[in-house]
């Protein structure tokens, strides 16, 4: 239980702290002061032992999505560094300086991809991919990309007359 992030006062703004059941947003858990078991050491372990592919296997409801969202919250350009104040990873000053808020992060979850048939599931998947490409559309202006890569990226965000992503 020593990893449980506790505040001095169990009551915040007159309300008791709650368990974050079903919440997979790291930012929401921290900002709304839900109980949180500090798993930020995972960030340190992952960045020190980086593999070409990292596989995270756990049964359903074991925090995979929350951990991936925590990692995104740490690495993504423009992240709110204060979210990690007081958490274990914040003690790793060099690691935070090198990695925190330094990367564009493509984050895809297939939780909401659904359909009653192949075409509707495909359309739902295309929408999920297109929305993530649109969220990171500033990447299409990166000086690190060739013109061809920029054009390919921009094509991912084109929508048709029905509001569907055309080129995903």
Residue ranges and their predicted role:
Residues 135-168:
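Mid-core helix/loop region of P-loop NTP-binding domains shared across ATPases and GTPases
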Residues 53, 106-117, 152-159:
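Short acidic, glycine/Ser/Thr-rich loop/turn "cap" segments at secondary-structure junctions
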Residues 34-35, 117, 121, 125, ...:
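Phosphate/oxyanion-binding active-site loops and adjacent basic polyanion-contact surfaces
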Residues 13-19, 98-105, 141-152:
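Short, compositionally biased low-complexity segments
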Residues 48, 73-143:
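P-loop NTPase motor core
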Residues 26, 71, 125, 129, ...:
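Generic structural signal of hydrophobic/aromatic residues within well-ordered alpha-helices
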């Amino acid at each position: 239980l020593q990893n449980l992030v506790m505040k001095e006062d169990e009551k915040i703004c007159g309300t008791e702290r709650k368990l974050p059941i079903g919440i997979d947003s790291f930012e929401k858990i921290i900002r709304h002061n839900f109980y949180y078991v500090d798993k930020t050491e995972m960030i340190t372990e992952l960045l020190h032992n980086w593999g070409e592919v990292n596989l995270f296997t756990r049964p359903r409801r074991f925090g995979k999505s929350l951990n991936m969202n925590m990692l995104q919250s740490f690495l993504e350009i423009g992240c709110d560094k204060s979210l990690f104040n007081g958490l274990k990873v914040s003690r790793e000053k060099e690691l935070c300086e090198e990695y925190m808020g330094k990367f564009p992060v493509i984050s895809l979850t297939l939780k909401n991809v659904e359909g009653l048939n192949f075409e509707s599931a495909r359309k739902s998947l295309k929408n999920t991919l297109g929305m993530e490409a649109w969220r990171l559309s500033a990447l299409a202006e990166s000086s690190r990309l060739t013109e061809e890569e920029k054009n390919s990226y921009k094509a991912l965000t084109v929508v048709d007359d029905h509001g569907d992503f055309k080129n995903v």
